[in-house]
Curated annotation (Swiss-Prot):
Keyword Oxidoreductase assigned: no
Protein encoded by which gene: DAL80
Species of origin: Saccharomyces cerevisiae (strain ATCC 204508 / S288c)
Name of the protein this chain belongs to: Nitrogen regulatory protein DAL80
Keywords, ordered alphabetically: DNA-binding, Metal-binding, Nitrate assimilation, Nucleus, Repressor, Transcription, Transcription regulation, Zinc, Zinc-finger
Induction: Sensitive to nitrogen catabolite repression.
Subcellular location per the Swiss-Prot or TrEMBL entry: Nucleus
Length: 269
């Protein structure tokens, strides 16, 4: 026997009569298997027989009628939400002892402003007081960058008015209970002219390198100029040779013209 799909009877009186006793003598639907009149949902099998929800589900799952021994007078409701809440509470209890979880939970409460820590409590750490007081995100001391001595000396060799001392602001922090005092001290000032003109100890090692670089540069320039001069002298010699050849040719042509002119002026008789 195979059960058809779940069926809610079309008559509203049937569903209303599910939890009402037969006190007025009217006919109420009755399960043909366990003869109960209380059920949250009425079903039918493939032959149209009226069954309660429990008998209908049992028949659909197992393919056989539900035994009478399984009949109960109380209707049990599912408690999924309660189980889920219990699971959540169980998980919360199991992870409540984790120090990382506790720290994150405290940090979340502090950042959202949902909680405050008593400053008089000796168990409260300085970090928690620091996070509660003043600003939630404290200022961190900037990382100091140490200038490279080689680069600094090279720059000083090229630009004699460029100091190598690092500039910046020094942030001082004092933690007293829950108060934070921050003070900015300007350490950088314009150097005096005498300070700029004084030789730097870092530049002594770079002086030979700079002098060698300038010497090499000057030698390259001298070689380039000598090459250019030799090229110009060669071109000048070529032009001189060509001019000399042209002068010789002009002289020969003049001699020929004079000879022809003399021959024409004295014809033979």
């Amino acid at each position: 026997m195979v059960l058809s799909d779940s069926l809610k009877l079309p008559s509203p009186t049937l569903s209303a009569a599910a939890g009402v006793d037969d006190c007025d003598g009217e006919d109420h639907p009755t399960c043909q298997n366990c003869f109960t009149v209380k059920t949250p949902l009425w079903r039918r099998d493939e032959h149209g027989t009226v069954l309660c929800n429990a008998c209908g589900l049992f028949l659909k799952l197992h393919g056989e009628p539900r035994p009478i021994s399984l009949k109960t007078d109380t209707i049990k409701s599912r408690n999924r939400k309660k189980l889920n809440n219990n699971n959540v509470n169980t998980n919360a209890n199991t992870h409540s002892n984790d120090p990382n979880k506790i720290f994150k939970r405290k940090k979340r409460l502090l950042t959202t402003g949902g909680g405050s820590l008593p400053t008089n409590n000796p168990k409260v750490s300085i970090l928690e007081k620091f996070m509660v007081s003043g600003s939630i995100k404290p200022l961190l001391k900037p990382k100091e960058t140490v200038p490279n001595t080689k680069e600094c000396s090279t720059q000083r060799g090229k630009f004699s008015l460029d100091p190598c001392e690092p500039s910046g602001k020094n942030y001082l922090y004092q933690i007293n209970g829950s108060d934070i005092y921050t003070s900015n001290i300007e350490l950088t000032r314009l150097p005096n002219l005498s300070t700029l003109l004084e030789p730097s100890p870092f530049s002594d090692s770079a002086v030979p390198e700079i002098e060698l670089t300038w010497k090499l540069h000057n030698e390259e320039e001298v070689i380039k100029l000598k090459t250019k001069i030799s090229e110009l002298e060669l071109v000048t010699d070529l032009y001189k040779k060509h001019i000399f050849q042209l002068n010789e040719k002009c002289k020969q042509l003049e001699v020929e013209l004079h000879s022809r002119a003399s021959v024409q002026s004295h014809p033979q008789h």
